[in-house]
Amino acid sequence: MATPHIRAYRGKRIHMIGIGGSSMSGLAQMLLAQGYRLTGSDNLETYATRGLRDMGVPVTIGHCAENVHGAELVIYTVAILPDNPERVEAERLGLPTLERATLLGQLMEGSPVAIGVCGTHGKTSTTSMLAQALVVAGADPTVHIGGSLDFIGGSTRVGAGRVFLTEACEFNASFLHLRPTVAVVTNIDEDHLDFYHDIDDIQDAFRRFLKLLPKEGHAVGNGDDPRVTALLQELDCHTVTFGMGVCCDWRPVNLTYDARGCASFDASRHGKTLGHVTLRVGGFFHVYNALAAVACAWTQNADIEKVCEALSQFEGAHRRFERTGEIDGVQLYHDYGHNPAEMRNVLSVAKLQPHNRLWAVMQPHTYSRVKRLFQDYLTCTRDADITLVTDIYAAREKDPGDIKAIQLVEGMRANGLTAVHTPTFDDTEDYLRKHWQPGDLVLTMGCGNINQLNDQMNEHERAKEAGPM
């Protein structure tokens, strides 16, 4: 069966399986803005599913075959396995289906400037920074972010300009469905090892993505990452580098950090300062993200002073070291970081915030990732005073039976960390409430549903304050 094209289904009913996912919910909003009729389903009720329902999209919680009845096109993500009852029923009925990444590629078609931001870490923050910068600079871009940015009112923006900006996710090599004219590569590291054989296989996927660029296109890459620079040297298109190294095209000059880890620097190209950035988000990694945004905006002839002004106003994307509330004098934060490098990075920022004790609440994500990066998990929360570990979030995987969260906890203790296994959200909340003290900071981390623990604790606190009905 030929791959269906989304443009043939305007005015027809489209059903989206897993509509509450960070990318899928954004694509749903984009399709809705363009006049498509949508329904959707997800296995959990979340702020994303509630938000879509408020926009008029019928969303069913729970997957069942009947959900696809009456649909003329079914869209799914790679996280929705072939044995999902809705996918099974769509196949039985002979309904055309479209994978999320293919849909994104189709929506980008025809854009004179198609920017894909890829990398193992920092995609969402870099895309969000670049989106805000391009809007302020007057480019009026269409945007798709795998997260939510208040500045654009959510995860998508439909603009009237020449630019289509999106995250380009390397999981399952889905970014190969895109056709970028500009690519930004933040870094290349080990991840998604349930799909890739090893780091060389990962690098080769990025190679194939960059090879999609036309000769007149631009590749913007981290000049401090040897795997990224090696790929840039293979390209025939224009290349631009950013980083701390003296050989990078864009560098931060007069770089300083405030007490909370927020950087201030001059954005310098080939030794010439073109703007000044004072970030409101902490962490050395955000210097790289901001430089990537500046360098990419420069390829589009954007006013760099306006770009830097926009970056200085950037407040961060949701689920990226996001403060979610305060209970009993304890500050609650959440971050999407789900592999050891990301957890280590965000904890380096958390420890700079005023606090008594720092709690790290880790939801390990997928059995394959935990197995392949096991040793790195054992020390990545060393900056925390106490680490709580929930059960592993399976996501798209089935439990192999040979890896458990308690093994992580035992390994952490062997490495001198204070670690506790709290299997469920109820277990975790109960432990926190019994042991936290005013002035503590609690950071939950993971890309599964661990953010719902923050929601749960806040809801319970509001109910307690309201008293008995």
Question: Which residues are covered by each model-predicted region?
Answer:
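N-terminal leader/targeting and accessory segments in enzymes
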Residues: 1-103, 226, 248, 282, ...
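Nucleotide phosphate-binding/pyrophosphate-handling subdomain across enzymes
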Residues: 3-15, 23, 27-34, 111, ...
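Phosphate-binding loop of NTP-binding sites
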Residues: 5-7, 30-33, 53, 67, ...
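Conserved hydrophobic helix-helix packing surfaces used for dimerization/oligomerization
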Residues: 14-16, 74, 115, 141, ...
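Structural beta-sheet core signal
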Residues: 16, 40, 143, 183, ...
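Short internal beta-strands
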Residues: 36-43, 219-223, 359-363, 384-394
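Beta-strand->loop->alpha-helix junctions that form or flank phosphate-binding loops
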Residues: 41-42, 60-63, 98-105, 144-147, ...
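C-terminal helical cap/extension that packs against the catalytic core
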Residues: 378-438
